[in-house]
Amino acid sequence: MAEISLRDVRKSYAGIEVIHGVDLEIADGEFVVIVGPSGCGKSTLLRMVAGLEEITAGEIAIGGRVVNRLEPRERDIAMVFQNYALYPHMTVRENMAYGLRIAKLSKAEIEERVARSARMLELGQLLDRKPRQLSGGQRQRVAMGRALVRNPAAFLLDEPLSNLDAKLRVQMRLQIKELQRTVRTTSIYVTHDQVEAMTLADRLVVMNAGVAEQIATPAEIYDRPATTFVAGFIGSPAMNMLPARGLGDALEVAGQRLAVPAPAGRDLILGVRPEHLHAAGPEEPGFELHVQAVEWLGADAFAHGRLADGTDLVLRTPGKAPVRERDRLKVAPDAAALHLFDAETGKRL
């Protein structure tokens, strides 16, 4: 195991910078998830750590050793890819042992490592099968087993669950979490799926257009997003964003005055998560929501509607709550769960 350090890491293609000075310190044994939309630079950043992409500027160190000029095989890392990358003509046992044979480990050591990893990943009954005889989830476990047997300093996982169906993704998430709890190997995991990110990570790196917008624990990112991008990306449905105007001792939002101190004369964004809206009392300041659609999910329902000024709003309600399309509701935000952002910069106040 080892710590991983990225210092002002940059990447350019044809003179155009696509990764803009990322700084990240990953502790020994920590599980860090890099999350963001397609094209944000998360896989490029992972590939630079792996040595599959050259860095344009900055420094990457693994276990205190600068690896900028080292080949992937010299970095003591193991990668797990989205497409499994298994040898189709080899059995599960042979796939898992292949890298160890190349490293010229003894037969006894290879057998012991394969057997131990197979037990961890519940692959014992599959060791003599070929990849074509396995399900998608089983293939991904074999790919993880092949990485695990190497006892690397770090695991790098690039969207490993993307090819699996929803049920298998849940199963594999739980297995990855249990595996990390057992082996405590330093890991960087890339995904666009916020559920994977929130459930697996010790810390998250939220990427946007080559910039690490926020690096924090899942709870901190959900409760105190640093920017409107982070607030809108993490959480489903996304946080409601309401144009607002600071009045000093209050906030003007959608024609209503809320008793929320805010810089006078400043254009702001008020962020409210769907679960932090409630039915307003008769004397309570609130917004009239014209419900246009209701998504019923069983335990919960999401009412999608529009305010008088045309702003879209989503309200989370209990699944049994009698909210219907075309209803008009008076709703108010929970005062303790408001988020204020600068309208120009998008940064949290």
UniProtKB/Swiss-Prot annotation:
GO biological process, one term: glycerophosphodiester transmembrane transport
Summary of the function given for this chain in its UniProt record: Part of the ABC transporter complex UgpBAEC involved in sn-glycerol-3-phosphate (G3P) import. Responsible for energy coupling to the transport system.
NCBIfam families xrefs: PRK11650.1
Gene source species: Cereibacter sphaeroides (strain ATCC 17029 / ATH 2.4.9)
SMART domains, alphabetized: AAA (SM00382)
InterPro entries recorded: AAA+_ATPase (IPR003593), ABC_transporter-like_ATP-bd (IPR003439), ABC_transporter-like_CS (IPR017871), ABC_transpr_MalK-like (IPR015855), ABC_transpr_MalK/UgpC-like (IPR047641), Mo/tungstate-bd_C_term_dom (IPR008995), NA-bd_OB-fold (IPR012340), P-loop_NTPase (IPR027417)
Enzyme class: translocase
Gene expressing this chain: ugpC
Family in the record: Belongs to the ABC transporter superfamily. sn-glycerol-3-phosphate importer (TC 3.A.1.1.3) family.
Protein name, per record: sn-glycerol-3-phosphate import ATP-binding protein UgpC
